[in-house]
């Protein structure tokens, strides 16, 4: 999720709870897994189902739409942002004490499984805006990892009249940072950035506006990135496609840093010499 600032686009990051089994304590983008309810009757309460299916042509249309619904639901649960429009196609405003309190209750209810996101959207006479989500990346966990994830990353602009905040349950802190500032804080060991988050921030670093970033995302070629895990001299390394030590060392679109070294729970990014291992 992005917003414009005087210093360029800023990205919304949440800090995962320390006790979370996967990436505990790391700063990440809001997100999570697809639930069964994310597949249900989407045409009745969602706009942009055709857009969603077109963005994920490698999946059956129903699964492609469910990925988008899950992204919107997780954004509401973890950041309190609702990508939904009213009958005039205006994004719902969450300003005002009464409105804020009501949607805080809705958020807690969705998070706790008492309500579905569909229930909230239909109760308020809204439509979920799947067309506001732009696919820009596809990551798969290394084959040796005990937890396997196949993750699609989406980009969106924070709607007007909505203020994101972490949920104080799965996430314990949130912040807006420019990509450069987030990377600098990671280098200084102030925050932990997982390799996919670091790589995404590096890709966003050069854009001057959110419109520029969204335009890039809409036209880029989506590559399936599956890092490889390597232990060398007792040091854990994560190698991206394009790194000379990766099984697929040839990737014309490989990011600047293709190698991440884990030291004391912090990932350190390294630019490798792609001509030799």
What are these regions (language model features)?
Residues 1-277:
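N-terminal leader/linker segments that precede catalytic domains of diphosphate-processing enzymes
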